């Protein structure tokens, strides 16, 4: 079944998590952030947008998006996985002002890109500490794809992670905890067939 989802790619002001405006749902690994920070320092570039969700019970923003995406898109292509991407560019100042007003009091929930977001914060701080930027410069912002949390095309795919080297890790205790909420099936075979 083909799905379709619409959102906004926007320049979003970076906020510390403590402010409760942009919210994470997972912890990050320092090694991945270090790599990304070094890449940003070397290139002064933001290579990949963050994916964030917002709540809009009236779906007013989605109505605006639908209205702005009636004409032929500025760009359309199908990627190697068969996903078609369409991009419309909004230049009408009134529409932009309306969209900005829509988000004035909204929280954003990071769906994908926790490492990138934290790296963007670290990069902004690095630039300020080293006199490379001031408040309002580009490093105060991050490219984020914003999607209505109740969009009918929203699909959340599973993420499979391998956990290892945890101190005092007890596999049976973890599996017992999982059995409270899930059906747990033991798989036999070599590691490659299971992972």
What are these regions (language model features)?
Residues 1-195:
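Surface-exposed, charge/polar-rich loops and edge strands
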């Amino acid at each position: 079944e083909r799905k379709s989802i619409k959102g906004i790619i926007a320049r979003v002001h970076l906020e510390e998590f403590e402010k409760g405006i942009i919210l994470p749902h997972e912890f990050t690994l320092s090694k991945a952030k270090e790599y990304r920070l070094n890449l940003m320092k070397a290139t002064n570039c933001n290579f990949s947008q963050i994916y964030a969700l917002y709540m809009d019970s009236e779906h007013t923003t989605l109505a605006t998006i639908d209205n702005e995406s009636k004409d032929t898109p500025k760009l359309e292509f199908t990627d190697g996985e068969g996903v078609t991407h369409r991009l419309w560019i909004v230049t009408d100042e009134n529409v932009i002002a309306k969209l900005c007003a829509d988000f004035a009091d909204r929280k954003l929930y990071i769906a994908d890109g926790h490492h990138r977001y934290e790296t963007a914060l670290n990069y902004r701080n690095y630039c300020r500490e080293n006199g490379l930027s001031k408040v309002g410069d580009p490093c105060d912002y991050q490219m984020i794809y914003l999607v209505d949390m109740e969009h009918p095309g929203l699909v959340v795919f599973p993420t499979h992670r391998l956990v290892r080297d945890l101190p005092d890790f007890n596999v049976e205790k973890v599996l017992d905890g999982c059995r409270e909420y899930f059906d747990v099936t033991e798989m036999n075979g070599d590691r490659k067939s299971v992972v």
